[in-house]
Amino acid sequence: DGLIPYIQTIGLYRSKAKNVLETCRLILEHHGGEVPRDRDALQALPGVGRKTANVVLNTAFGEPTIAVDTHVFRVGNRTGLGKGKTPLAVELALLKNIPDEFKVDAHHWLILHGRYTCQARKPRCYDCVLADLCDFRHKTPPPGEASATPALRRKPKATGAV
């Protein structure tokens, strides 16, 4: 209960609080109080999947991992750097295509690029440093220009009146 006030603004905070406390207990009991540096050991902790394990390995230990969140998934697929239908497929494609010297930082660059430039609804292709490499740029015109594809037209709502 002591942890909940600090995390109650995030979704599923009760189960996350339970997982955090259990994870701390397991790290103390099974890992001598040290966060494991192994993906399998991390994923054995409650609430830790591949994405979270990759974040820990990358940020805490400087490992060349790519945690595929919604932004990385979108940027990877739009640019062709990491095409795939699943986060794992995108991760593996990105690891194959990104030069070794950039792998540690690429995860953060891709997240920021997806958050601020290659946005889901209104991508800023006209302002993108990767536009010349990206197939998606033709789908998003600069502000003020007509859309490359016609906007969907909404059907009027039925009122029930005859």
Regions found by a protein language model. Name each.
Residues 154-162:
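Long, low-complexity, intrinsically disordered segments
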